[in-house]
Amino acid sequence: MENNLVRTGTLEHKNVVMANALTRSAQGLNLAEKRILFSAIAKMGNNFGKGEVYLYATEYAETFGLAPNQAYEQLKENVRNMRTRYFTLAPQDRTEGNGVKRRGKRGMVWEINWFQKIGYHDGDGMIGLKFTDDVIPYLHDLEREFTKYKLKQACALRSVYSWRLLELFEQHTGNAGKGWWAVSVEDFCDSMEAPDAMRKNFGKLRSQIIQPAIDELVKKDGWLIGFEAIKEGRKVVRLRFDFERDPQGNLF
């Protein structure tokens, strides 16, 4: 039987690997759904086989610090919604002269379902997931333009915004553990799937998404983060993040 289908221990030391286009995409997930999806990706590693994976409540509980009964309830409750979840790929990215990555506004926008089918087994305390054929090229056998991090880095996070920011930082982190990311406010909001009220009010965006996410990554995943809001006139139009691993940290 494939390792994807058997019970293992904690998944926290396994890697999450995905194409950069997927990292930037709107993923359409709440925190529990994101935990399930990326646990599945981490468990499969590079052994996708038929695109099927089983997640056991014991694995999920050990990974995210939950009681087994609570873990299975969370798995079963959320997996039922994941059959219809999808990610959104914007038109081809482009880079402006100031180095800011900006998404194209013309061209096809694709909405791609994560899973072809889902299942659950009350007796064995597990769920089953089968990825769609369209998503596998963004997760499997990647040679370039990909984001990689250990699931452990996200296990303690309590905000999906923090997790999204972690992924975007990892996409732009160099071999020395340092990096920077400049992005338009519009594209940042798209990647973070910010509500309309925050898109229209930078003060709310900063206080309810940006700063809490920065604070959580500093506290729980050992980052040093600098942040700048860049204005044109009186309006904030771009963001710049500078980040590196805290040399005093011992997470790994």
Regions found by a protein language model. Give the residues of each.
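Charged, alpha-helix-forming regions
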Residues: 1-252
